[in-house]
């Protein structure tokens, strides 16, 4: 069998593209090739004849020129006749089109790349293709968990506990403290942040006040800035962030968001099916949600280009002790838009655990923080009810791993 035997670095200026090359190269493809060259280097050599006529590699040459590369590796194909050269130029492009993909293995490989913070777009697949690949057709459902009833039960979580809930992790701690995130993340990076911080409205239900919900404006900014800064440090460079908030504190949220290193792409609106009665002359029927990503990074998008900033989802049945509780389908919507299956989704204000349940239903992994021991209990019990078992539930406490049954049985009576 005849084969090539010599490779040289050849100045691009000496190469002669084939004038009748029928293969076209779109600007999008050239951009992908340029990204590939920057990441991997020029690995796949150009095939040429002894007159420096290009047989294969026209697209790579165009990308190299735009990258300012002056010499490229070339392999000489001495054994081809003129007719064989013409045929190979066509065959090299056409036969590649006959190859297919084992989509299950492809998903596994791309998920493993994202797990180590590697940009999946560098594989050559664009965002729409990745969206189709990971579209599992899952429709998240409301679980109707009774938060109010659970809050009345004895508390078994202690501050500092790290709960292992299947693949998910929950720490009972302070989101303004960097060490809380260090313990929670255990070396991993978040592929997405979606969170619902306190709104600073001084709400009080039958279970008591929501923590960190009544501060002076300056202190509330500092609170948000510290929390946002900690989030930014543990996010992958291509991770997006969604922050639900109250318009009455919109200025503090936006200032802290920007100061912590996030680019604000826009503000989405959750439109509820009915208004919420309050003291304002205009009754609120919506909640805003900041959307952005790290200023020093970029973002991933795994759906189409027809998604609106208006999100219409019914609010859940009343849970009086967590008035801003989000419906599961609402949270699943941005989760599926901005992450792939098996991605790590961070929620530093876990609340009643809606983000964790949305992650469980959409095959994501939730890492979450909650300051209030009572609401940590809610998250644990809500997860158990969702999966129907406490078999894979344990807590890391004082250096020991304890099963759920042992911890729950030691809760004091009220």
Predicted regions and their residues:
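Polar low-complexity intrinsically disordered regions
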Residues: 1, 106, 410-414
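S-adenosyl-L-methionine
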Residues: 159-182, 380-414
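Core catalytic lobe of class I
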Residues: 2-376
């Amino acid at each position: 069998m005849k084969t090539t035997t010599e490779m040289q670095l050849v100045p691009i200026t000496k190469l002669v593209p084939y004038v009748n090359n029928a293969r076209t190269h779109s600007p999008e493809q050239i951009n992908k090739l340029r990204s590939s060259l920057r990441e991997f280097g020029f690995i796949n050599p150009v095939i040429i004849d002894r007159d420096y006529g290009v047989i294969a590699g026209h697209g790579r040459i165009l990308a190299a020129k735009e990258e300012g590369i002056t010499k490229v590796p070339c392999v000489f194909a001495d054994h081809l006749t003129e007719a064989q050269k013409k045929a190979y130029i066509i065959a090299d492009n056409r036969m590649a089109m006959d190859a297919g993909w084992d989509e299950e293995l492809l998903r596994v490989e791309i998920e493993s790349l994202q797990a180590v913070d590697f940009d999946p777009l560098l594989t050559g697949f664009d965002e729409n293709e990745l969206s189709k690949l990971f579209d599992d057709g899952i429709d998240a459902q409301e679980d109707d968990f009774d938060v109010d009833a659970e809050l009345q039960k004895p508390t078994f979580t202690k501050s500092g506990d790290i709960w292992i809930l299947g693949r998910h992790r929950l720490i009972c701690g302070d989101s303004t403290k960097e060490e809380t995130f260090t313990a929670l993340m255990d070396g991993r990076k978040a592929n997405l942040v979606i969170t619902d911080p306190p709104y600073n409205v001084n709400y009080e239900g039958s279970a008591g006040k929501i923590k960190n919900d009544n501060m002076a404006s300056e202190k509330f900014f500092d609170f948000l800035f510290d929390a946002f800064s900690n989030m930014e440090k543990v996010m992958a460079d291509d991770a997006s962030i969604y922050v639900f908030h109250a318009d009455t504190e919109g200025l503090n949220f936006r200032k802290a968001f920007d100061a912590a290193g996030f680019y604000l792409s826009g503000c989405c609106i959750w439109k509820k099916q009915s208004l919420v009665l309050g003291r304002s002359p205009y009754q609120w029927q919506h909640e805003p949600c900041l959307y952005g990503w790290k200023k020093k990074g970029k973002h991933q998008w795994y759906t189409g280009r027809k998604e609106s900033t208006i999100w219409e989802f019914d609010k859940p049945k009343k849970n009086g002790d967590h008035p801003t509780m989000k419906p599961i389908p609402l949270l699943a919507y941005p989760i599926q838009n901005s992450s792939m299956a098996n991605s790590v989704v961070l929620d530093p204000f876990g609340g009643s655990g809606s983000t964790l349940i949305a992650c469980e239903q959409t095959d994501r992994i939730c890492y979450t923080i909650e300051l209030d021991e009572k609401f940590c209990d809610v998250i644990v019990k809500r997860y158990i009810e969702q999966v129907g078992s406490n078999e894979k539930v344990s807590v890391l406490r004082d250096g020991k791993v304890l099963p759920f049954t042992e911890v729950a049985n030691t809760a004091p009576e009220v």
